[in-house]
Amino acid sequence: MDATYEGDLGAAAGVPFRVGRESKAEFGEPGAGRTYEYWKSLPASGSTGESDNAVQAYNYRLCLTNDPDNRILFPKPASYNRNEYVSLIEDVWTGKNTQRAMLKVTGEMMEENRRHIAGGNQTKLPGDSWGIRKLSSIVKLPNQKTDGNNQHAAFISTDLPEENWPWPTSSWEWRDKFAKRLKDYTLGLFWFAQNDPELPEHFRKAMLEWGLAKDEYQDNEYFPRQVYVREGRRFEGVYFFTAKDALPTAPGKRPPLHGSSVTASHYALDSHAARKREAGRVHLDGFISYPTAVYTVPLGVILPRNVDNLLLPVPVSGSHIG
């Protein structure tokens, strides 16, 4: 059994696989190929639907806390590069974000927001967030902790697009180097948000309320060990799962029902960004989310076509969107 994202065993066994994004033309899937959308799911200019070798971004899921007695402030990594984070400055001052509410936002509204913040206030721009929520999604956990994930409405957060593209087929030496790079990038982002003098002082103070939980990952500098690898190799199996398997066949109907189903789900079809910020775009390339109805997943997605005695329950047979 190969229950890894990377699928190294499946590849060694000679099972054909895919890496990257299919074109929209191949399976007719929403959000396939190169695509730009406001968060959530409002198409914008620049989308081509073309296939490429882009892999959606990875990050670390952080255990954060605002409990002063259990908080470790983010250290400044030795490889810190301020230039990686400076775009956050204008985003904080103007309130610029990737929500569909930005459709009605004018340049004057963003300048008014800048003046509003300069007066010691928090942002008032539609769709914007302040403090830790500008950089990270916050899901509450017990003991005054949170699961900190990438902030989908931001241009810069804990995801590190593009640099992870080689991960699925690379050696573990390369993967370990990227994991260290991603850790340093993440720590640098939060250190910047807590300390850079060009950010509003009250924004920095709000950020300083948060840190890593000091009773978690104590043997790893309070930092998660595992990169959140959202997608790696996708093998070609007895059944190839696409978006059409998770979307209703018609209004008021349900998705196709698979008689060989081994599980059911209702999670959205979603992807994180595949590219870094680009001038003039309303969001990062590839950031999409589409609601589904309850759908079934057939056994064939974990059975390789041409190899016996092998199951692939994580690097399954399916498209990028599927």
Predicted regions and their residues:
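Flavin (FAD/FMN)-binding glycine-rich loop and adjacent Rossmann-like elements that form
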Residues: 3-321
